[in-house]
Amino acid sequence: MKLTCVLIITVLFLTASQLITADYSRDQRQYRAVRLGDEMRTFKGARDCGEQGQGCYTRPCCPGLHCAAGATGGGSCQP
């Protein structure tokens, strides 16, 4: 009888802790996804223009920079 009560209490405790942990994890994952989306928007590779020193053969330079031709035929964004 005592063993049965201990097992029932243990199962209830573990179930409750699983439910609490699952609810907490769901909120954290949602926040992480939002943060990851913000990081992707500001990622250098996702920009539509070339930064200073980057090549300008396939995409235009960012505002305030112009494409300067290099000795090897390729250009780079310069102020």
Swiss-Prot record:
Q: Cellular component terms, GO, for this chain's entry?
A: extracellular region
**Leader sequence residues:** 1-22
Keywords per UniProt: Disulfide bond, Knottin, Secreted, Signal, Toxin
Compartments in which it is found: Secreted
User: Got any disulfides in this one, which pairs?
Assistant: 49-62, 56-67, 61-77
Q: What tissue specificity is annotated for this entry?
A: Expressed by the venom duct.
Concerning InterPro entries, the annotation shows: Conotoxin
The molecular function terms in GO held by this entry are: ion channel inhibitor activity; toxin activity
Propeptide ranges are 23-46
Annotated family? Belongs to the conotoxin O1 superfamily.
Domain comment in the entry: The presence of a 'disulfide through disulfide knot' structurally defines this protein as a knottin. The cysteine framework is VI/VII (C-C-CC-C-C).
- Any idea what this protein is called? Conotoxin 1
